Amino acid sequence: MTPVLQVGLEVDLTEFTQFLWAHKVPHRVTEEGQSQTLWIAPHINAERIRELFGYWQGGGELSKVDVVVHNPKFANSLSISELKRLPVTALVIGLTALITLLIEFGANSSWMIHFTFTDFVISGDKVSYQTLKTMLATGELWRIWSPMFMHFSMVHVLFNLLWIWMIGGAIERKQGHSHFLLLVLFSGAIANLAQFWISGPLFGGLSGVVFAVLGYTWLWDRIAKQPLFRLPQALFGFMIFWLALGYSGALEFIGLGAIANTAHLAGLVSGLAFALISKIWRV
């Protein structure tokens, strides 16, 4: 994400962020020291957001304005040639979009049953599902990774794909296709296995891999001789804060649905571990 403006902690951004959510503008607010920073997705017109913020701070009514969200420069960056240079990133994005549409954001169980960690049957209020041993014995090994491509809301899939495009793409660009593929497979398997162990097969999302790539880039820059990714320190702090919010139940309370907290934590740990493994064995 891209920082678009920074204000003091005394400024209450609630109304402005509610306005952004209402217009489906992906964003985050982080705090560091005595200031707070508004981050937006790269396809959002940053100048327009600054104009709207100034208008709002001047007493203007946000209900009377429109939001122009697309940044034409970003559209150009998502060219076919760029996707060809990042085949693993493109594959992850493509599979996520395809499978999420096939399951209709979780509404189509006849498709969803093919991508959950194990096969399952719902009878009334009870869910019965295969054990891990049975799943492996049947040879359906794709299920180890397929849950990460399922998403159950538009906001969820957009946020995850933006992180994968920005951070995952940076890893692939700087360290190679095979390196990023190994990170995705390693962290995806661990996150999915951990979440299955805790909650059964009814979960999905790339968030475990997102936490992995964030943790990986953060630690890599701290153990390498020269920083490679140079992500803001506040980003890792926000990631830990978001993880804590998930475990507190606050995210479910405000209507974001069930959160795969174990997958998030396992993904973060696997990303940190992969950074250490890569550094030691030069994967």
Please tell me what each predicted stretch does.
Residues 2, 9-23, 28-51, 55-57, ...:
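A detector for small-residue-rich transmembrane helices and their helix-helix packing motifs
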